[in-house]
Regions:
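Alpha-helical solenoid repeat scaffolds of the TPR/TPR-like class and their adjacent stem/linker regions
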Residues: 1-371
Length: 371
């Protein structure tokens, strides 16, 4: 089993399946062997075999939460949102334990009226997840609660507290005032019974900070060139970062084209800073203090080209034309083989066909850009 997990980690999925087959032959009633093999099948896009394995695991071991969680992600990946969002609640028994909070008030999953009640929403998981589900705050307003209290992480405070939704925004570690219901933000798609056909995708649903806009506008001179914002790497701590992030070198052909390039990248390596210094790409990382800066910089661009990070979500939420580069093994949110996103109408997706090889999506993107 450990050898199979090790092979999976280095993207040797066929090899990992062989190891899990050995485990299953030796011990056919051990549920998590099927769960692990299912993940390998999913990585190879053998989705029916993956679901069979996850189902086999839950039938052998109904108390193994990881398998329900993996079923959730597979359903969502395939666009079966009804089952996917219901099973998504298993995250609290799986990897998301660290974000779980226990309040004496009632968890709201859409079943009770919140009219004239106070509801508290708190963040979980990544920055991109927060932006993706922030759209539901406007829908909560339509249910006429007495008040919505929204907790945000520090980098979002300035951006979210200046939106026009008339809600109470609090920073982290601030005790919310009295409330009747609470909900983690990633449970809102379930609460609003979200399916592919009714994803609330009216964009922009995020406004930039007017004061920040003025500051950023002063940094830019009039240009006849297409302005392109670039982001090639995500948070190195993300478990799929080795697949979803690119090297700056991968953009070498792209940045040789006659456009005006601006880097939206934070936390560049020493090597990347050297490359940027010797190129025509304009580096803004020292001016990007928080997401209100990033949003205003995105607003100044004509097109965003990025990998799967918070930048894609910010750009999509702002309604900015975005070219998103995805690995062959990508997040459930971007679904399977779609070139568009039901969540963000302004995003166009360019996917790898072989894991680790960015040449095909980059070639398609460059051809699109030239046209």
């Amino acid at each position: 089993n450990n050898a199979g997990l090790a092979a999976y980690k280095i993207n040797s999925f066929n090899e990992s399946i062989e190891y899990f087959n050995l485990c299953i032959n030796k011990s056919p009633n051990t549920g998590y062997f099927y769960n692990n093999r299912g993940l390998s099948f999913q990585a190879l896009k053998k989705l029916n075999l993956a679901m069979e394995d996850f189902n086999k695991c839950t039938s052998l071991d109904p108390k193994y939460p990881e398998s329900y969680w993996n079923k959730s992600l597979l359903h969502l990946f395939q666009g079966n949102y009804k089952d996917g969002w219901e099973l998504y609640e298993y995250r609290w028994q799986s990897f998301a334990k660290e974000w779980a909070r226990d309040y004496p008030k009632k968890l709201w999953l859409g079943n009770e009226s919140i009219k004239n009640k106070v509801i508290f929403i708190y963040p979980e998981q990544g920055h991109g997840d927060f932006i993706q589900c922030y759209r539901y705050i406007a829908l909560l307003k339509d249910l006429h609660p007495k008040k919505i209290i929204l907790e945000v992480t520090e980098p979002f405070y300035k951006l979210i507290s200046t939106q026009d939704l008339e809600i109470e925004v609090i920073g982290p570690n601030i005790q919310p005032s009295k409330f009747d219901f609470y909900s983690p933000i990633m449970s809102l798609p379930l609460a609003f019974k979200t399916e592919i056909s009714n994803v609330p995708n009216k964009c922009p649903y995020l406004l930039t900070n007017l004061n920040k806009n003025k500051i950023w506008e002063k940094k830019f001179e009039k240009s006849n060139y297409l302005r392109i914002g670039l982001c090639w790497a995500g948070n190195p701590l993300h478990k799929n970062n080795h697949n979803r992030s690119m090297l700056l070198d991968d953009f070498s052909e792209l940045i040789s084209l006659p456009f005006e390039y601006h880097s939206l990248q934070k936390g560049m390596t020493h090597e990347e800073q050297k490359i940027i210094k010797n190129s025509d790409v304009i580096d803004h990382q020292d001016s990007l203090k928080d997401f209100s800066d990033t949003a205003s910089l995105i607003k100044m661009m004509d097109v965003i080209i990025c990998v799967d990070t918070v930048i894609a979500h910010l750009a999509g939420a702002l309604g900015k034309k975005t070219f998103l580069l995805l690995p062959d093994k990508s997040s459930f949110l971007w679904m399977n083989e779609r070139k568009d996103s039901p969540w963000y109408p302004s995003i166009k997706i360019f996917r790898q066909s072989t894991l680790g090889d960015w040449s095909k999506p980059l070639k398609e993107l460059i051809s699109d850009l030239k046209s």
